[in-house]
UniProtKB/Swiss-Prot annotation:
InterPro entries linked to this entry: Flag_basal_body_FlgA_C, Flagellar_FlgA, FlgA_N, SAF
Coiled-coil residue windows: none
Signal peptide: 1-26
Protein name: Flagella basal body P-ring formation protein FlgA
Pfam families tied to this protein: ChapFlgA (PF13144), ChapFlgA_N (PF17656)
UniProt entry keywords in alphabetical sequence: Bacterial flagellum biogenesis, Periplasm, Signal
Protein species of origin: Yersinia enterocolitica
Presence of keyword Signal: yes
Family as reported in the entry's similarity comment: Belongs to the FlgA family.
Superkingdom to which the source organism belongs: Bacteria
Subcellular location as annotated: Periplasm
Length: 224
């Protein structure tokens, strides 16, 4: 083989090596981005799929990229993800598809109706296609009043509902401390407004401040 042939083979081998390295780093980045979003949803019932929309030849290349979500970024949908490699920050465009549970109306509700737990049903489906403010658990809706007509099966959102304070700041409340095989009743004064299933802080007669959950009957439950 002449000298030119040797140089051509060497250059070809170098280009193949660089291409293989780039593909390996790209594959690693894809895996790391998917793992990053999986960690945002520790619930085992949530399923996450990430599609990187930025062309692969524009992906940052390094062994240990620092991946972060921009401030106030949505948890799913189209997200511009910050990736820092060797001190240089770049943004890659991703589409995050998340499937999990969300709350829907179990029946048709008229405007002004107070919702009970029986009016709420949990459904499995794509979360990233839901309207803004969709409820992923029933607590917010329980005891709230519908601001407009809600159809059966319609996803519940925060702007559809007005929560009713069952406890108001300064109100005397009954506190029920629940332990294994026993419970203790006492009284205190609420330090904040709270609806059913909300967390409320209570100042006890001794001056001690405790936190508990508001039950349907307005008592504050503390698990010991």
């Amino acid at each position: 083989m002449n000298r030119n042939g040797v140089i051509t083979c060497a250059l070809g081998g170098l280009l193949l090596s660089q291409a293989a390295t780039h593909q390996a780093m790209a594959a690693d980045l894809s895996v790391q981005v998917n793992q990053f979003f999986q960690q945002q949803y520790p619930d085992k019932e949530s399923q996450v799929k990430v599609v990187i929309k930025t062309p692969q030849n524009q992906w940052p290349q390094c062994d240990m990229p620092e991946i972060t979500l921009p401030a106030n970024a949505r948890p799913w949908g189209n997200i511009s993800l910050s990736v820092r490699c060797d001190g240089v920050r770049r943004f890659i465009q991703t589409q995050v598809q998340v499937s999990g549970h969300y709350a829907v109306a179990a029946r048709q509700l008229a405007a002004g109706e107070k919702m009970t737990l029986q009016d709420i049903k949990m459904k499995q489906g794509r979360l990233d296609t839901l309207p803004p403010g969709a409820l992923l658990e029933p607590n917010f809706a329980q005891g709230a009043v519908s601001l407009r007509q809600i159809n059966a099966g319609q996803p519940l959102t925060r702007n559809m509902l007005r929560r009713l304070w069952i406890i108001k700041a300064g109100q005397d409340v009954q506190v029920l401390a629940l332990g294994e095989g026993f419970n203790v009743n006492s009284n205190g004064k609420a330090m904040n407004n709270a609806a059913i299933q909300d967390n409320v802080r209570v100042r006890m007669a001794s001056g001690q401040i405790v936190s508990g959950t508001v039950a349907d009957d307005g008592t504050v439950h503390i698990l010991l």
